[in-house]
Amino acid sequence: MLALGKLLELTLAGREPAEKTQLTVEGVRMRWLAEGALEVRPPQARDNGTDLLLSAGIHGNETAPIELLDELIRSIARGDLKPRARILFLFGNPAAMRLGARYVEQDVNRLFNGRHEQSGGAEALRACELERLAASFFSLPDRYRLHYDLHTAIRGSKIEQFALYPWKEGRQHSRFELARLRAAGISAVLLQNKPSIVFSAYTYEQLGAEAFTLELGKARPFGQNRHVNLAPLRLRLEQIIEGSEPQPDERLEGLQLFSVAREVIKRSDAFTFNLADDVENFSELEKGYVLAEDVSDSRWVVKEEGARIIFPNPKVKNGLRAGIVIVPADADGLG
C-alpha cells in the first residue's frame, strides 16, 4: 500500500509525508495538500467529470466517519478501489482529533461563510484553510460538484442517520440527490430555508456544489463504532468514486423530509431548556409546550403541529443556536 494511504495515521501523529505525491499501479495520483488533506485524481482517460469532496473530523470526537474515510483512502492506495472521480479527502480539525475532543477552543462548524474572519485562533485559521482547499478543488469548470460532510451526533436520535441540505435563494433542492441519499441509508433530510455558517453551506452557497451535512449515529471514540452501520453509505460512496452507481429511485419512498420551523437562540446565561438532558434528536413536541426560557421572560412555546426538536444543546455560547424546531415537509418544489 502507498504511504499516502495512511493519511489518518499521519494526521493523528502530526507528521507530513516524506513523499507528497504518489501514483498507484493503475495511474491514480494521490497528492498530500496540507495537514489532513489528500487529493485523489484518476488518469485522464478514466475521469468521468465528477468532483467529490468527502470531509470528516470537523468535530474531532466524531470518529465513525473518520474511520470510514480512512478505509476508502486505504482501498484506493492498495489499488482495490479504482476511482473515476476526482476526490478531495479532508480531516477537518486534526488538533481536536488528536485530543478526542469536539473542538479545542471553537466549534469549527460555526466558522464558515466568512465567520472565521470575525474570530481568531487556530480553529478560525483552519476553517479559512478548509474553505481555501475546497474552493481550489471545485475551481475546474464544467464538472459535477458533490460534497458530503460526515458527522456523528452528540446525543442519540430517533432517526439515526439523517442529512441537512443547505439553502440558497433561487436554487432548488435536487430530487436526484435526495434519492441518492436514500440509497445510501439516509432515513430523513432536513431542507434548510436560510443561509448557514457550516462547511456544507459554504460549498453549496459559494462554490455551487450539491452539499450535505450527514449525521450518521452517535459520537464514540476510535475503535468503538461497530454498532454504527455505515455499510450502505460506504457502498454508495464506492460506487460514486468508481462511476458504477446504479440509478437511484427518485420516488423517495421511505425518506422523511422536514423543514425548519424556527431556531432557538441562546441569548444569555439564564437560558434553560425544559427538556431532559438525554432527549433524543427528532423527539416530538406537543403544541403549547414551553420549550425553553431565557432572560427578560423570553419563552419559546411550541406553536407548530407535528413539531420535533433536533440538536438541543443549552451549553452553546450566547448568541448561538441552541436547537432547531422542525416540522414535516413534502417533496413539492424539488428540482
From Swiss-Prot:
GO molecular function: hydrolase activity, acting on ester bonds; succinylglutamate desuccinylase activity; zinc ion binding
Keywords, in A-Z order: Arginine metabolism, Hydrolase, Metal-binding, Zinc
Enzyme class, spelled out: hydrolase
Biological processes, Gene Ontology terms: arginine catabolic process to glutamate; arginine catabolic process to succinate
Catalytic activity: N-succinyl-L-glutamate + H2O = L-glutamate + succinate
Domain of life: Bacteria
The UniProt record lists the keyword Metal-binding: yes
Keyword Hydrolase: yes
Pathway(s) per entry: Amino-acid degradation; L-arginine degradation via AST pathway; L-glutamate and succinate from L-arginine: step 5/5
NCBIfam families referenced in this protein's UniProt entry, alphabetically: arg_catab_astE, PRK05324.1
Protein name per UniProt: Succinylglutamate desuccinylase
